[in-house]
Amino acid sequence: YADGTYPVISMTDGVVEQMGWLPLGGWRVGIRSDNGIYYYYAHMDSYGEGIEAGARVEAGMELGRMGSTGYSDVEGTSGNFATHLHVGIYIPVEGQEDLSVNPYYLLRYLEGEKVTTAEYSFEELPASQ
């Protein structure tokens, strides 16, 4: 992409639960899936059209653009590291903090399938994968 950013694509259907600036994560968006799983995308450059707290999103929808924001208390700081996307997946556990799940295998699956927009949400991945 000419501007040096890449699209950030939602891995799930759900609702934008949180977004905005975090000192470490920079511009970020958090999606709560219909099954309660929380998907976290951080270090974003910008948000996509219509992405706001409470908005409904679908798997494959562009959430915004990948960037290098964060690692500063100064809102909007970027360039302290290379452009990348920090992805977190958190499964709710009754009576405890959400369980952090390594997104590696989901991302490998999507990469292996050459998926450019998510064809499956995390909850719908074939059992054989």
Regions found by a protein language model. Give the residues of each.
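Short alpha-helical segments in extracytoplasmic peptidoglycan/chitin-binding modules
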Residues: Y41, L63, H86
